[in-house]
């Protein structure tokens, strides 16, 4: 799988039982990674790292995956959910940029962004593909801020869009890919 995906040397694969479990593992990885970011360690008074998800995104019904799922009707019954997961308008580069810009150590600043999770073709609210410019901007912002880019390919991976993974059509390489 690593070779087929064109992943860098040293990449790893985690096998689970479902898409939700794959997304759960990706979010756990992001939480662990976030603790290593400057200013994010709670042990030394840092602010918890954040995970950015998209409006209209669906990542599963387990607690972590549900926390990154946007639809209030699905989420509300199970609150409180995993903290420090925020939503930005899917496709809005300025909103994504603003989410990264909110990082700061001041009284109103937030912790650093550990990861951005997105589906390249959202299916919960219809078939809504994200634009290539948006996806490339997300990759660039993640690189600039040392955040992980998580691509949820549960509904789009393994050849469902004409390539092995949908991200291959966008000319980017994510840090984490989940699929079932």
Regions found by a protein language model. Give the residues of each.
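Conserved N-terminal phosphate-binding loop of PLP-dependent enzymes in the Aspartate aminotransferase
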Residues: 1-180
């Amino acid at each position: 799988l690593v070779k087929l995906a064109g992943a860098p040397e040293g990449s790893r694969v985690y096998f689970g039982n479902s898409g939700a479990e794959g997304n759960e593992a990706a979010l756990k990885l992001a939480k662990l990674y976030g603790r290593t970011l400057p200013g994010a360690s709670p042990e030394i008074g840092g602010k918890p790292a954040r995970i950015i998800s998209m409006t209209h995104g669906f990542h599963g019904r387990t607690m972590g995956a549900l926390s990154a799922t946007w639809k209030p009707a699905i989420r509300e019954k199970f609150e409180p959910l995993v903290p420090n997961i925020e939503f930005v308008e899917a496709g809005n580069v300025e909103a994504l940029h603003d989410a990264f810009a909110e990082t700061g150590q001041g009284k109103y600043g937030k912790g650093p962004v550990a990861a951005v999770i997105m589906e390249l073709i959202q299916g919960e609210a219809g078939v809504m593909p994200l634009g290539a410019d948006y996806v490339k901007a997300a990759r660039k912002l993640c690189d600039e801020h040392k955040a992980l880019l998580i691509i949820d390919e549960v509904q789009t991976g393994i050849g469902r869009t004409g390539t092995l993974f949908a991200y291959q059509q966008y000319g980017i390489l994510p840090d984490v890919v989940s699929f079932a």
